[in-house]
């Protein structure tokens, strides 16, 4: 009897488990087949990040270094052309030579080969010593330093009244000169007093007085002119160009020679009078 009861209990437990499993399967949410096919067919996106590679292209500093290196570098024995025009270390034209003959001459005289003119036909090369190449490179660097730097010109501004005292005007002139030496443009505005009648000529004389303190380095970039309905005057000073500096030095030297010549003429006349 006990055995029968145990069997009945086991069968009842199995039936309960089967019923629960069927109910769960019936109420479970099934995925949409369309969504499954869409997700399966959608490719994965690759995210690409742009990386800046190491290159001197577009880099002005890299280009300048490359140009300097190409402008005067030892070619060595890697001569791409078969026939080239050759100059010796003194600049004398040796004529057209085969590259094999050039290499033999280099080895014999212990010289280097430098490319001089690639646009000519055939290209022009020169035999040089190591010291000559070094001196030429130094000369190129000095020429690059002497070239004016490109970029916007900075302008300094100075404003003061027309009744400025001489001491203050000297101080302003020194400040302007310091700016001019640094290659700045200097805009100077002089305001006229309302209670005093002052002509444009008097204001212009102040500008000229400032300029006379530095005639060897400065000139007018914009000459004095009336502004603000005549209540002020303005001008712009700038540094002399190389050509203007040279012309100024030549004029000063010419004046000095004329002065010496006049002094010599005066002395000779005085000596003639004494002799008589």
Curated annotation (Swiss-Prot):
Annotated GO biological process: mitochondrial translational initiation; ribosome disassembly
Residues of the propeptide: 32-94
Pfam families (UniProt xref): IF3_C, IF3_N
Location within or outside the cell: Mitochondrion
Region Disordered: start-end pairs: 244-276
Record keywords, A-Z: Initiation factor, Mitochondrion, Protein biosynthesis, Transit peptide
Transit peptide, from-to: 1-31
A GO CC term assigned to this protein in UniProt: mitochondrion
InterPro entries per record: T_IF-3_C_sf, T_IF-3_N_sf, Translation_initiation_fac_3, Translation_initiation_fac_3_C, Translation_initiation_fac_3_N
PANTHER family per record: TRANSLATION INITIATION FACTOR IF-3 (PTHR10938), TRANSLATION INITIATION FACTOR IF-3, MITOCHONDRIAL (PTHR10938:SF0)
Family statement: Belongs to the IF-3 family.
Primary role: IF-3 binds to the 28S ribosomal subunit and shifts the equilibrium between 55S ribosomes and their 39S and 28S subunits in favor of the free subunits, thus enhancing the availability of 28S subunits on which protein synthesis initiation begins.
An example Gene Ontology molecular-function term: translation factor activity, RNA binding
Protein's UniProt keywords contain Protein biosynthesis: yes
Stated name of the protein: Translation initiation factor IF-3, mitochondrial
Classification lineage: Eukaryota, Metazoa, Chordata, Craniata, Vertebrata
